[in-house]
């Protein structure tokens, strides 16, 4: 087993842009073990990623929508129907029978439009200053980087099942690992 000193020295030679999002704790937890290789520390999309005021507002709005729907279930009378809408949007089809699930969805098109309108631009400007691998635990930064032609991009899947929105609009053209 390598000594801690040798391991630490080796880690100093490895560097990557490490990006997360405040969409539940799972995304932050997934990148925490990578803090020692993160260039400029762990970047949180919409917070310390170089986003403009407009970009930060977009991320805040997304977080508010996510949290509102996630917590809606606890509201008497209307909570369950509101959560059902959210659950429908986040529906993950059964794996079997195996079939082609690459068709774009409403969420994929919405993400595509948001990225084209500037979502993740601050992050892209920041990571473009130094060509390092991008490792992210949230799909939006990975897909934005892929759309901008940035390489290499690695996306950590935090859940056992993933929604179609975690995959590029044209998955066969994507370079995300």
Language-model regions, residue ranges each:
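Positively charged, low-complexity intrinsically disordered leader regions
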Residues: 1-13, 54, 67
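Nucleotide-activated donor-dependent transferases that construct or modify glycoconjugates
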Residues: 12-21, 46-48
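A short, glycine/small-residue-rich beta-strand->loop->alpha-helix junction that serves as a flexible
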Residues: 20-32
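Short, well-ordered alpha-helical microsegments
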Residues: 26-28, 141-144, 162-164
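Conserved N-terminal ligand/cofactor-binding loop architecture of enzyme catalytic domains
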Residues: 32-125
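Glycosyltransferases and closely related glycan-assembly transferases
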Residues: 38, 121-133, 142-154
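Short His-centered aromatic/hydrophobic patch
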Residues: 137-139
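Active-site-proximal region of nucleotide-activated glycan assembly enzymes
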Residues: 148-177
């Amino acid at each position: 087993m390598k000594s801690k000193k040798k391991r630490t020295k080796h880690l100093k030679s490895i560097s990557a842009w490490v990006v997360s999002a405040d969409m539940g704790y799972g995304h932050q937890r997934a990148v925490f073990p990578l803090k020692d290789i993160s260039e400029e520390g762990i970047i949180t999309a919409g917070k310390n990623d170089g986003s403009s005021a407009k970009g930060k507002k977009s991320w805040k709005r997304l977080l508010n929508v996510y949290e509102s729907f996630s917590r809606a279930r606890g509201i008497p009378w209307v909570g369950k129907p509101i959560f059902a809408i959210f659950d429908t949007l986040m529906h993950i089809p059964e794996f079997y029978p195996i079939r082609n699930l690459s068709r774009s969805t409403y969420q994929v098109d919405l993400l595509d439009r948001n990225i084209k309108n500037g979502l993740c631009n601050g992050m892209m400007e920041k990571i473009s200053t130094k060509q390092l691998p991008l490792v992210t635990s949230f799909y939006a930064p990975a897909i934005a980087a892929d759309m901008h032609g940035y390489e290499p991009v690695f996306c950590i899947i935090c859940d056992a099942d993933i929604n179609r929105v975690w995959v590029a609009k044209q998955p066969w053209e994507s370079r995300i690992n």
